[in-house]
Amino acid sequence: MGEPPRRPRELFLAGLAAAYLAAFVSLYLQIPGLYGRDGILPARRVLRLSGKGLWEQLRDVPTLLWLGPQLGLDTEQGMELLCLLGAVASMGALLCAPLRDCLLFAVLRVFYLSLYQVGQVFLYFQWDSLLLEAGFLAVLVAPLRLFKWRSTAWRPHDSVTFWLVRWLLFRLMFASGVVKLTSRCPTWWGLTALTYHYETQCIPTPAAWYAHQLPVWFQKFSVVATYVIEIAVPLLFFMPIRRLRLFAFYCQVLLQILIILTGNYNFFNALTIVLAFSLLDEEHMGRWMGRGKRKHGSSAWPPTLLSFLSTLLELATYALLLYWSVHYFSLEIDWEKGLLESKVAFTYHEFTQWLRAVTLPLVGLGFLSLSWEILSALYRCACVRGFFWKLWATLQWAVFATATVGMFAISLVPFTYIDYESNGKLWPGIHQMFSAVERFQVVNSYGLFRRMTGVGGRPEVVLEGSYDKQSWTEIEFMYKPGNVSAAPAVVAPHQPRLDWQMWFAALAHHSSSPWFASFVHRLLQGKEDVIRLVQVDEDKYPFSTQPPVYLRAQLYKYWFTHSAESGAGAAQWWRRQHVQEFFPTVSVGDPTLDGLLAQHGLKDKLPLKRPVDAFLPWLLSSVRQLSRPFSPHVVLWSLYVVAATTCLLRAMARRPRGGAPPTRHKAPKQPRGDQGEKNGQLRRKEGREAEERGEGRSRGAADGEGPRGTKRRK
């Protein structure tokens, strides 16, 4: 029945720890400017004392920050403490395998959920929800290593809980592909979305400029490939043929790497690759590590009937995938022009009819795949040696299989949002279960890049400050486009959340972004924490010595320059055109500004006094001072370099040294027949005793775990 996914599981847990590290550190470096008492959206507004008991407060807003006052901390300091503890714990889990424990991942998940509850608009991104859901699954997937009385190399039910990660990946990718068509966006239906995407995404990379120069026919073909990878290929996640699953894995990795190269999407794409590790198996991971196991007789000829049928089905799947792509996107090579033509060959009505027809069958496909994993795990439990350990394994299987089925059932509600008719056919009890856990972000709906914005030019808000209303100076951000001569930044896995919200603000009227008035107000006040969100380097902020008296915001349209536009002067990455005023000229005390602040409850109130002699606030302040001189993305890169260097040095230390064989053993002695027989009997006896103590493996498990334990005892 196959091996439990021990190595893929460890890779998933390590990758998730790396994503948590990016999330905690990135947010920590932005807390004062975003959520501090002098920040844009002070977090204390969310947690208002109302006279309720602690449990009632936790029920309404589940966050550990309610406990802050008992530690002498306000809401901002509580957020900093959670981020620091989360960063330390995630770094430990990344570097040390024994720390990848279900209890530690439960703590990380509670920490991030606590931050999410007060994060307001700056934490309302799909990757934050994805991290919370993946973090909850990690609690089920990770072993309990707190007790060392039994080996935790693998558990018979590991493949059951790990299947939920695959199901999450399927929901993420399939929904992301489907919503592009259900949104009726003309660019996605016309296959021209990528001709706009590279220059209109929030924070492009320098590689995006070069990708934007690619010919239109290639951009359209890239959209077709995106549809195939996001809609068709995810169906292979549940195929019984492992080579099809590996093909699906590498397709997903290719797509995510290309997105990473051309856009700054923080930890999102890396986290998606981490989820894709659920498609791997022990054999393939062993080949990655140079420890592949040879299957005797695997190269025998002629092949067995099962192997032949498997290969035939695999080839048929590839052929069907190719036919589906050519037929439904009218792929045709124009030999005279030397290009590949493509267009959508189906209508919106036909697509919605197809989606309605396949949504519930896809649920059935997922249920069948999960049922197979559950039965396979039960078989492995039956193969465990020793009555007590067999009973213990079966009890664990029952608990985790029930939890997995429950998670699968709850996830059907957000998954079927892609077709509301199918959503209405779900059992009412499933909707009730989902409503009960919805505020805990256990499962979520997904669907990225639903509509392509910026058609006709990328809208961009440019802030300008002045002392006299006559001469205006632009305020340039660290990351988002502004100066047309400045190259696009590379900041991932850091997410500059203010820059992202500036991108959303430019898509509508400023009244749709209430935080913007507070942002302008803080700049007029010269609040250092908010200024650091714009520029860490004071020399690059034009009003570092004295705050501006007046501020206004202009709306521009930005476009990437073309390669033919490069001249003899300084290279320009962008060209822009003024559109209109985005935010009127205001100053401190301006009635317009005060009215906007009062309308959204953002007017300054007398904050609570902080204790000055408490140890914990002093410690948090000291740590904050250490991070101030550095840019956030540099801090994150440095932490990852430290982690990578540590892992590399550890791997080099574990690698066996080459060179001449040791001289103390002249030659391996050949045991006499009777002595060799006694040694063999002794080894078999030790193996049986180990299995009876719980060290035993299922009969269907791979060889290789037991001998390691024997070597340690020797």
UniProtKB/Swiss-Prot annotation:
Entry's transmembrane regions: 11-31, 79-99, 103-125, 159-179, 221-241, 257-277, 304-324, 358-378, 398-418, 629-649
One biological process term in Gene Ontology: protein maturation
InterPro entries, per database record: LMF (IPR009613)
Bias kind Basic residues: ranges: 654-669
Keywords for the protein's UniProt record, in alphabetical order: Endoplasmic reticulum, Glycoprotein, Membrane, Transmembrane, Transmembrane helix
Compartment(s) of residence: Endoplasmic reticulum membrane
Positions of region (Disordered): 654-714
Bilayer topology term: Multi-pass membrane protein
Pfam families noted in UniProt: LMF1, LMF1_C
Main location: endoplasmic reticulum
Gene Ontology annotations for the cellular component aspect, listed alphabetically: endoplasmic reticulum membrane
Glycan-bearing residues: N483
Purpose of the protein: Involved in the maturation of specific proteins in the endoplasmic reticulum. May be required for maturation and transport of active lipoprotein lipase (LPL) through the secretory pathway.
Record's protein name: Lipase maturation factor 2
Organism: Gallus gallus (Chicken)
